[in-house]
């Protein structure tokens, strides 16, 4: 164990950060949550993901601008604290930590569900436990090993989604064998493009925002990234490409090929359903394996992000110093182990709730991403007032883009509160209240 004076090293390169930005949001929200989004919105889910993607782009641009102006920032907590104060930074830190620890717990269960495709008789909790142990070990080895693992897992995800798009377009436009080109009739049949009206679209936004959550993890890598002032803006510029390639096109293909009201009637991911339609032997197994890797990749990133939040809090004296201690591999070992506890809580919940565990956790996570993006948006607005010179990277259409994102997020938040289960809303509100009380009782002492 190294002494307390050791700090995190800048070992992640541009290619690591670029791939984390590209693949960071490709996880359970896309592959498993997609069924829920389509079920409530129908074909209009395409509009929901387009709107969510535009909001994401504007928020990420603001994050990149703030990162460029403050090269010494370790995470986006430091960026927010400078402009919005101690409480906002404290609140952001803990809801972001809560988001990731619940997310990795949810994704451990989802990964187990996909493994059950091959091992239907094996209990979910056993499979979730095995996956949790693997992800823990990868994060404990070293930052370089984590970054390389994440790089190749993200590469696999991206490659397969590209293959999915190509095969999906062939199914839409080309007839072969027993398959007849599907066309676009499913977009308007079965109740129309908006089968549940505007309510369905608004309800789907919670899943959409959750699906996009994770992209902002590049704001947690600042202390371990070489030249973050150059790398982060470069990663953000790829956001629009990611939105179109990894969300809009796949969802357009899914709701065009499969009647929207049949997507949630089977336990399989709609991505696996499309691969089955191709008729290639074993195609569904290949897609299932790739989805499994994608979810493990997202868990990997989540454990990284949540452990760095604990490390930063401990380094600043807000948590016990043990969480700031680094191992011989220069990773915050105790912070990682603390965060893995959520994985095993997820395993315990799955022992009783089974496959429904993911749905229970996803609603609260959607709320959290909304609040995280709102805080980043408000921080960007205020940071411009403190700016004395134009940074190397800046948002050209400021403040219109940032205000659009904030107003849209507030509208979505109101709509989601009105359409989401009161249980999920109540639990989330209770967690936020607990964080606020903790700050008032204890957090102020360390400011």
Curated annotation (Swiss-Prot):
Induction: Induced in response to leucine limitation. Regulated via the T box transcriptional antitermination system.
Coiled-coil boundaries: none
Gene3D superfamilies per UniProt: Amino acid/polyamine transporter I
Entry keyword set: Amino-acid transport, Cell membrane, Membrane, Transmembrane, Transmembrane helix, Transport
Protein localization: Cell membrane
Molecular function as annotated in GO: amino acid transmembrane transporter activity
CC terms in the record's Gene Ontology section: membrane; plasma membrane
Pfam families: AA_permease
Disruption phenotype: No growth phenotype is observed for the knockout strain.
Superkingdom of origin: Bacteria
Membrane disposition: Multi-pass membrane protein
GO biological processes: amino acid transmembrane transport
Spans traversing the lipid bilayer: 17-37, 40-60, 95-115, 118-138, 154-174, 200-220, 243-263, 289-311, 333-353, 361-381, 393-415, 419-441
Family to which the UniProt record says this protein belongs: Belongs to the amino acid-polyamine-organocation (APC) superfamily.
Record function comment: May participate in leucine metabolism. May transport leucine or a compound related to leucine metabolism.
Protein name: Uncharacterized amino acid permease YvbW
